[in-house]
Each structure stands twice: as structure tokens, then as C-alpha cells.
């Protein structure tokens, strides 16, 4: 039975590959991410890696998670506004070190290997969901994974509130469902990136992801 399930998983992944649903990304990088448009608009993705000399000053939140100190005022303001609407949220993930990012990617790869995929295929499949070290916004400290507190607010309620309101505080959903072919990351309703209020408003109004917005500047 276990072997049968593994075969089904491998077959399912192959069918998704053939249908174009899975987008494989490479571990190799092309350029260092640029700050030409400001620190808040640094584009980090599979072709723009974080420069080796990039420094971030972190602030620890009440729950122990860390973020870039510059986003704390707007992040706090957003959470206060949510509470006024009876939406109680928390930052589930903030800043990550390169080591932590590598560990998460390795764990995801090992999971797919345990399901019967060869190492190379498992890694490439994992990269659809986990960024390689140096290409994760979590290493900038500008990205936060936000969830409901599980006491008064469900994750879905938090996601709905963020979808409607996050841009007012300078945050945007970084990996929208309809932008996967551009971001090369599957939809993540919990992952929000600070870009500043001006950019967030324009991205919200024009339905742009960060790649599209930076290209338009």
C-alpha cells in the first residue's frame, strides 16, 4: 500500500509537470538584488539574490519573531487596526538566517524524497514552495507570515482581512494566486511583504506583483 501511494504521488507530480502547473526553478542566481528604487522595493527572487554585504537591523516582536526595524511602526499600526475589526493576528515567521532557510529547503526536499522522488526532482519540486538561501525575502526582514491567533481568529479570516486592508499600511501579498508564472512561487495567502504605502497602493489598484511594479519604474 505504501509503495502504491508513492507511485501515485510520483505519477501525479509528473502529470502536473506535463500540464505546466509546476514551475521548476534553478538554485543558480543571475544578479544581486538592487536597492536603486529604495530599500523597501528591493526585489529578491530566484534571479535576484541578496547581496553578501546586505545588513539588516532587527527588532524582536512580542512573540520573539524578528523583523527589519524599519517596518515595525506600520506593522504595529496594521495589527491595531485589525484588532479594531475583531481580527486577532500574529506573525508566525519573520526574519530568517541563511542557515534556517537552507534547513527548511532541505527538510522539504527530504519529504519529497521520502515519497519516492529522486533527489534532483525532489529539490526542484521543493523550490516551488521554498526559496533557496539568498533568494528568500525572509532574509531581508521585510517579509512576514501572518496567521490568525487560533483563539479568536482563524487563518482564513486573517487572510481575508489582509487581502482588503494590508496595502493601507504598506504591505502587499507577495505571492498572489494569479501571478505564479511571474513570481515562480505558489500562492501564499499568509506571506506579506513591506513595500511602503505609496507602492502598496499602486500595486493594489493595478493588481501588480512586486516584479511587475519594479519593472514599471
PLM region descriptions:
Residues 2-217:
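Extracytoplasmic cell-surface/polysaccharide-interacting catalytic and binding patches
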